[in-house]
């Protein structure tokens, strides 16, 4: 069976690649991390077929982990109530790997960041693999770069299934982790070469060539990302668009008021009362034309110094995500120009 991981760039057609492989006969399991990308995939599938075919199953990751990997095999025995996104206490008692109390609260809610390990520890992985092989012909994973901690280890185990496996992602769009648990895979995303080696070790073929050009971003935006943010990306198009920093207060207010131009903030976009999103949360969103990226002071200083590539990796990756949402013009605005609109408390 084919086992492939495709390393792509923003806007290169990751979603299209998945959807083009679908038909109305082959049974396909699709897993992605964020709800936004789940919704985007669902929309694209319906656009292709006019409806959502019954032979295709689409999950967000933690729904897949709990309802597909855990419930059929362990729920009746363990009598758990669901999944909690609260973390286990660092100050509480330490339980061993074979102690159920390590994986759930006193009220029997499963810790999300240890659920994949629980599936492994209970020797359930082989059952999950058998279930995938029984019900599906192919297993596709989108946003693979966000799998971390025990979740990444589980994913590497599941790719041993005797079905086609295709994982798609962009290493530099790693802005969130599915979960973290102590030092488990803590340096997974610290080195691109070592990251790729993990997939090779799982006997997956690496595709580094088929999705290297963005179909979304103009040459101007791609050149800016490559030269200033330090992440290589090319454009399928020779189109030129504006990439600029606004330093005029009145112009910034016009951008703020515009219902057609999304404002992307590092965080707390909801406090500004405009058409907006956060940098990282804009990942998977493909419907913006012109984009306004709001720069906090450290990012503004780096922009002016030509040093955006030196931002800490998490911030740099989120900035890359934000900039690569633009199909048209890419405008930067200092957040100082928009502070007057920020609510002290979200309503």
Predicted feature locations:
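The feature marks helicase ATPase cores and/or their adjacent C-terminal helical subdomains
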Residues: 1-347
């Amino acid at each position: 069976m084919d086992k492939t991981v495709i390393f792509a760039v923003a806007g290169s057609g990751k979603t299209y690649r998945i959807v083009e492989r679908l038909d109305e006969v082959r049974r396909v399991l699709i897993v992605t991390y964020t709800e936004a990308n789940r919704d985007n995939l669902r929309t694209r599938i319906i656009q292709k077929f006019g409806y959502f075919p019954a032979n295709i199953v689409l999950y967000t990751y933690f729904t897949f982990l709990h309802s597909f990997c855990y419930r059929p095999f362990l729920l009746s025995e363990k009598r758990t109530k669901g999944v909690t996104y609260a973390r286990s206490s660092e100050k509480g008692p330490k339980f061993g790997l074979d102690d159920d109390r390590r994986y759930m609260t006193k009220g029997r809610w499963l810790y999300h960041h240890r659920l994949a390990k629980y599936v492994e520890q209970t020797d359930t992985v082989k059952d999950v693999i058998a279930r995938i092989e029984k019900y599906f012909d192919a297993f596709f994973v989108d946003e693979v770069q966000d799998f971390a901690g025990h979740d990444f280890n589980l994913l590497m185990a599941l790719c041993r299934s005797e079905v086609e496996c295709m994982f798609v992602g962009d290493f530099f769009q790693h802005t969130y982790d599915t979960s973290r648990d102590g030092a488990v895979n803590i340096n997974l995303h610290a080195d691109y070469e070592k990251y790729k080696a993990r997939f090779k070790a799982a006997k997956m073929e690496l595709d580094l060539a088929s999705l290297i050009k963005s179909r979304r971003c103009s040459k101007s935006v791609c050149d800016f990302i490559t030269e200033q943010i330090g992440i290589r990306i090319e454009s399928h198009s020779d189109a030129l668009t504006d990439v600029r920093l606004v330093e005029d207060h009145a112009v910034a207010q016009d951008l703020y008021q515009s219902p057609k131009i999304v404002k992307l903030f590092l965080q707390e976009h909801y406090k500004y009362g405009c058409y907006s999103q956060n940098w990282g949360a804009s990942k998977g969103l493909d419907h913006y034309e012109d984009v306004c990226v709001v720069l906090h002071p450290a990012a503004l200083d780096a922009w002016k110094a030509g040093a955006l590539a030196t931002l800490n990796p998490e911030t740099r990756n989120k900035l890359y995500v934000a900039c690569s949402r633009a199909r048209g013009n890419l405008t930067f605005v200092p957040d100082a120009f928009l502070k007057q609109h920020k609510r002290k408390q979200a309503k």
